[in-house]
A protein has these predicted regions:
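A composition-driven surface/loop motif
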Residues: 1-269
Length: 269
């Protein structure tokens, strides 16, 4: 409970015969629950260097959590549940959030950035992906699709391309900004998942490019900002629990390695 924890690991995978071991930021051989506090993890050694790993169930109830990892940022052998807090994940070679069981988000703010296809912002294979609250943004080569009959909060999945530093926004028919986000890296094939209590049954427009003034940013996700000057990329009507537009790629692929890449600013601690 409380406090500040900063973990940095740089070790490579060690292989001895049939055995291997990789440096993790935080690893639990059983269930892991985070209640509060500030937790920053950087794990950059290479394949297997996951940020926070649980060999059973992972639950996040609160806290300010930022994870920069070569492999999965959050990984659980069973289920992952996020009930609150501010959670940021940036992987340079795999998924942002990877659950080998179900994935449930009921509250908080979660921004998860995975690498290019087949890696995802959110990956829970073909298991239930339940969203009932919170502000949720995932970006990567693909994403697991929220399970419509388990969700009570609407989501949109948009597929296209994106360049590092480019803005993307979602506006309602009355001009209200629901989402303003700065894409953290270049994707030839980008899949973006967004869910928010503000996303209701109605008509929306997705814009790319443009500029942002004012507001505050949580690792590229803006609140209270003025976004204008973007080019219309798509329109959609959120008349179902999950809306898919563009050339989005479904997730659920087995994890794999990827090339190292540059991360966001502020990680040089």
């Amino acid at each position: 409970y409380g406090g500040t924890l900063r973990v940095v690991t740089t070790g490579k995978q060690y292989v001895y015969g049939r055995l291997d071991s990789s440096a993790k930021g935080i690893k639990s051989k059983s269930s892991l629950t985070i209640e509060s506090g500030t937790i920053w993890v950087r794990a950059t050694g290479g394949e297997g260097s996951e940020g926070i790993e649980s060999k059973n169930v992972m639950t996040i109830n609160g806290g300010d959590i930022a994870v920069y990892a070569y492999d999965d940022c959050l990984n659980a052998s069973n289920n992952i549940t996020i009930n609150g807090g501010s959670v940021y994940c940036y992987s340079t070679g795999n998924d942002g959030v990877d659950s080998n069981g179900t994935l449930t988000i009921t509250g908080g703010t979660v921004v998860a950035s995975g690498t290019a296809s087949p890696e995802d912002g959110f990956d829970c294979d073909q298991n239930t992906f339940k969203i009932t609250g919170g502000t949720v943004l995932g970006i990567g080569g693909g994403t697991s699709t929220p399970t419509a009959n388990s969700c009570t909060q609407r989501s949109v999945i948009y597929g296209g391309s994106g360049s590092a530093g480019q803005y993307i926004g979602i506006q309602s028919s009355d001009g209200t900004n629901l989402m303003t986000y700065m894409i953290p890296r270049t994707y030839q094939q980008m899949t973006l998942l967004f869910s928010s209590p503000q996303l209701e049954n109605g008509s929306y427009t997705i814009y790319t490019g443009g500029s942002v003034t004012d507001g505050s940013s949580f690792y590229g996700l803006y609140t209270g900002a003025i976004y204008d000057g973007g080019t219309q990329a798509a329109t959609f009507t959120a008349n179902s629990m999950v809306t898919q537009i563009g050339s989005a790629s479904g997730g659920g692929n087995p994890g794999g390695g990827g090339g190292p890449g540059g991360g966001p600013g502020g990680w040089g601690w």
